């Protein structure tokens, strides 16, 4: 099976090619707005949808406003028009849904907006324009010698290169290299060996199993430390910027944000890789993960704890586990985790409301069973997450290994 993956490179403001990318992104914005004007005008005046083919024909022939010809390649211009068409498709789909379900909306969906006059827009080049030569991505002559050294060519399962996306950020560009790899057509068979993962803060991932092996905990304190430092610094510099220059965002704040995001992304990659490697090395073909959709709306935590929690992208970690698992043929099952923290695995309780009693979760992260047996609270939660998917899993052989899980650090 062929799947798509993305490799990212960062172009900062001090890069010699940065002004060139700014110019291209500005021209991309101009073309988007020009085409959007044509589509909006046709829709408002004649109630007709000007499609991609018509847009392309009109803009190619426009000699007065040559936004189309200002683009670095004809294919890059066409990609912008396709993005605009996609935006209009989304608009018409929203209108259709609004007509049937007005209660879901605050008002009628609005027409696709123009990009800011001084703004930038994404630039896309296809494999028609960007070629691989001797392991290097070579760009058209209009890119003045710009090249990239992609890492995806070193992958054993690499199939083909698709496109490059230049995504503008705050005084930076993210270069996204889109490529295809081959992954197993079928998942590895269910061998009856399961891992279950409870995601949290101090313990980023508490990982248990159904075969009596000692649980492991992937340390999350490194992530908390990164986030705590970032929040403290940003708060300070925001206050200074507002007081001194009446600004909401500065270059220093942008630099801090980029570094923080890079560190967290790196940590998440290492943690997800550790989990997948652990599953493969120990012959676990299925991974169950508790997914709490209301993480970001958590209101019962203190402000300090909540600040750390909402700043850590737990869903990003899950997505990394999912695509790495897909590469290896492992099965990942997401399940909601309600009532798992206050019901007892050792007492074979179902994780349902009638069994929920949070008072059994005592200090220092321990959970006490009805018989007085102590178990690590996150380990108990992880086992109850497994029970939501595999109700017949039991506590045989678990008591002796569940009190003190093995803590591992990935940074």
Language model: regions and residue ranges:
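Short amphipathic alpha-helical coiled-coil/interface segments
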Residues: 25-28, 81-88, 253-261
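Generic detection of short hydrophobic beta-strand segments and adjacent strand-loop junctions
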Residues: 6-12, 145-151, 216-218
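Stable alpha-helical structural segments in soluble proteins, enriched in small hydrophobic residues
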Residues: 35, 80-91, 377-389
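Non-catalytic, well-ordered alpha-helical scaffold segments
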Residues: 19-22, 26-29, 75-82, 269, ...
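Acidic carboxylate diad motif detector
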Residues: 53-169, 311
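Gly/serine-rich nucleotide phosphate-binding loop at the start of the catalytic core
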Residues: 1-79
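A generic secondary-structure signal for well-formed alpha-helical elements
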Residues: 32-39, 43, 88-95, 203, ...
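Positively charged, helix-rich recognition surfaces that bind polyanionic ligands
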Residues: 5, 171-411
